[in-house]
Amino acid sequence: KTVFVVGYVPDVRWQGVEEPSLPDGSKFWARVSIQTVFEEQTALAGNESKRRYTSSGLVFVQIFCPKSNAQANEFGKKLSEIARNAFRGKSTNGAVWFRNVRINELSPEDLFYRFNVVAEFEYDEIANKEPESGFVPVSPEPPVYFVDGGTFN
């Protein structure tokens, strides 16, 4: 869907993935990151080897719109809506669900107008007591984040 807004698929930068170069200052681009806020124990198991934890946090999709484009603000709003709609009312097959999705307009930077799309997420996982096994998600699928076109992997 983003290709219909700006004429190309904007570059997407991911948290924890080093890029060899800075984004092109004349192009729209996005940065996706998460922040885990809580990992609370939500249920005691009758068997002490497993306990349920609920993890919650925030997904951020930061959208950068080049000031050199006369329609940057308009296109930024449209790109933000695509990102918002990718999360609004959605959950993954792995039981990660999203809520309270919103668009925040931020102060501009030197080269870019900026928008933040923020989605709260939540999922459950089972923690094994054995140290070598670590955490085992209730579902095998980890949180899934926004990708182009408002769909999930």
Task: Identify the role of each PLM range.
Residues K1-G46, K78, E132-V136:
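Small/polar-rich, solvent-exposed N-terminal microdomains that initiate assembly or binding
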Residues D24-E39, Y53-S55, F98-L111:
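Short, charged, surface-exposed interaction patches
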Residues E39-T42, P66-A70, D124-E130:
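Short, cysteine-centered beta-strand-loop-beta hairpins and adjacent loop/turn segments enriched
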Residues G46-N47, R51, G89:
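Histidine-centered catalytic/metal-coordination loop motif
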Residues R51-K67, Y113-E125:
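Oligomerization/assembly interface segments of phage tail-like spikes and tubes
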Residues L58-R84:
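Mid-chain, well-packed structural core segment of small domains
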Residues K78-E132:
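Acidic-leaning, charged glycine-interspersed low-complexity segments
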Residues P131-N153:
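Viral virion structural and adsorption modules
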